C-alpha cells in the first residue's frame, strides 16, 4: 500500500494508492492531526494484535481489525448483494471500503505520527 501525507495551513491530509482510498478517507475524516488518536489505535493494534478482533466505530468510517487484516468501511455503505448496483456506483464503493494487512496499517499510522511530529 502506497501513501503520502501533505500539510496545508496546519491541516494534514492522507492520500493512498488505488484500492486503499477508504483508508485515506478514514484518516482524513476521523483522525487528521490527532496524534493521541493515532497512538491509541497503534497501542490497541500492538497489544491486541494476536489476542482479539478490534473494532473502531467512527462518525463516517469504521475500522475492523483482526490478526491478519484491516478493513476500513464507510458507515453508510450497504453491503447487500441482493440489489445490483449500476456500473457508475462501483467507483464509489471502491472509495468506501479497503483492506490491508495489519503490518501495513501499523506502518501507515506510524508514518502519519512521524509526519505530524515533524
UniProtKB/Swiss-Prot annotation:
Pfam families, sorted: UPF0231
InterPro entries: UPF0231
Top-level lineage group: Bacteria
Membership in a protein family: Belongs to the UPF0231 family.
This protein's name: UPF0231 protein PM0457
Species, as recorded: Pasteurella multocida (strain Pm70)
Amino acid at each position: 500500500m502506497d501513501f503520502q501525507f501533505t500539510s496545508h495551513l496546519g491541516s494534514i491530509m492522507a492520500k493512498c494508492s488505488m484500492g486503499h482510498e477508504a483508508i485515506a478517507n478514514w484518516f482524513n475524516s476521523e483522525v487528521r492531526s490527532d496524534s493521541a488518536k493515532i497512538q491509541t489505535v497503534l497501542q490497541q493494534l500492538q497489544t491486541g494484535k494476536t489476542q482479539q478482533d478490534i473494532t473502531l466505530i467512527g462518525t463516517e468510517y469504521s475500522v475492523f481489525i483482526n490478526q491478519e487484516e484491516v478493513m476500513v468501511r464507510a458507515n453508510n455503505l450497504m453491503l447487500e448483494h441482493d440489489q445490483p448496483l449500476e456500473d457508475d456506483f462501483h467507483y464509489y464503493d471502491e472509495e468506501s471500503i479497503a483492506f490491508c494487512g495489519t503490518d501495513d496499517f501499523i506502518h501507515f499510522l506510524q508514518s502519519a505520527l512521524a509526519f505530524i511530529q515533524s
